[in-house]
Amino acid sequence: MTSPATSKQIAPFFSVAFRPFFLSGSLFSVLAILAWAGVLNAWFSFEPYANSFWWHAHEMLFGFAAAIVTGFLLTAVQNWTGLTSLKGRSLMLLWLLWLAGRLVLAFDFGLASGLIALIDLSFLPVVAFVLGRLIFKVKLWRNLIFVPVIALMTIANILMHWGAISDNPELVNQGNYAMVMLVTLLITVLGGRVFPMFTANGTGTKKVEGIPLLETLTIASTVLIALIYTIGFSLPVVIQAGLLIFSGVCHFVRLVRWRFWVTFKTPLVWSLHLGYLGIPVGFILMGLHYLTGSLQLSTVLHGLTIGAIGSTILAMITRVSLGHTGRKLQAGRLMALAFVLLSFSFIVRVFYQYAGSDYAYSMTMAALLWGLAFGIYSLSFFPKLTTKRL
C-alpha cells in the first residue's frame, strides 16, 4: 500500500505514454551501453541471453528505440485522434511488459528460450493494437502507416530471436538491419511532417513546403530499403549500393531545403537537423560499403543507429518532454552539450578506423559519450517527467 504522497508522485508518471517510456528508455540506454563497454573491456562478467553481441544490438533497438517510438506514438495519437490513449494502470501494465523483456534478456531466471522470446516479442504487437484501435476509430488513414511499420518491427524481432535460438547469425543480422531501417523510415516520415514546421516556428522564418517529387522519391526509396532488409531479399551489389546512395542523396537534398543554416542559434532545432543528417551519411556510407568493400558494414551502420536514430531521438524527446510538461521550448546549455556529445559519439564510432585509433578504445569512448548524452537527459528531465504538468 502506498501513501497519498507517493501516489501523487507516481500518478503523473503514468498519465501519458511519453513519460515512462522516454525516461525509462533513456535510462536503459545508458545502462545498456555502459554494460556493453564493460564487456568489451572485460571490466566485469556479464552473460545475457544469447550472447553479449546479440544483446547489445537487440537491446539498443528493441529495448531503447522501441520504447521511445512507443512513447512518442501513443502520445501523438491522442493529438491526431482526439481520443485518450493508454494511461494509469493500463499504461503501467504496458510499461511493465516492456520492462519484463529487458529483465529476462539481461539476467538468467532459468526460463526456456522460447518463453524468453515470447515475453519480449509480446510488447510491440500490443503497441500496434492500441495505436491501430484509436486510428481506426476516427478513420485517420493518413497515420495508419505506423501500424504496419510496428508489425514489421515485430517480424524483425522474431528474426533476431529465431536467429539466436537456431544459432543462425544471418537471421540475427537480417532482423537487426531490418529494425534499423524501419526506425529510419519512421524518422523519414515524421521528419518530413514536422521538421519544416519546427524549423519555421523555432527560427521565426517561413516554413519550407516540400517538393512532391522529392518527397515521393525520398519516402519511397526508404520504404523499399526497409522492405528489402526485412524480407532479406538479395539484390545485385551495384543495384543495392545505387539504391542506398540515391536515397541518401534524396535525404540530403531534403535536409538542405529545410535550411539548416538558419537553426544555428536554436539548439532544439539544429539538433533535429543534425540527427537527420545521419540518414544520408549512413545510407551513402552503406552504399560505398557494397561498392568498395573497404568499409565495415557494422561500422557504417552506426551512422544510422547513432547519427540518425540516437541523435534524432534525443532531440525529439527533449522537445516533446518540454512541450508536454508545460515548459518553454528552450533546450538550455546542458541539453545543447548532450546533443554535441552524442554527435561526437557518432564521429568516434563511425570514423575511428580512418584515424588509426584502437578499436576497443574508440568503441569505449563512443559508448561513454552516448551514456553522458542520455544521462544528461535522464537527470535533467527526471523531475519533469515524474511530476505534474506546469
Labelled PLM ranges:
Residues 1-390:
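Hydrophobic alpha-helical transmembrane segments of multi-pass integral membrane proteins
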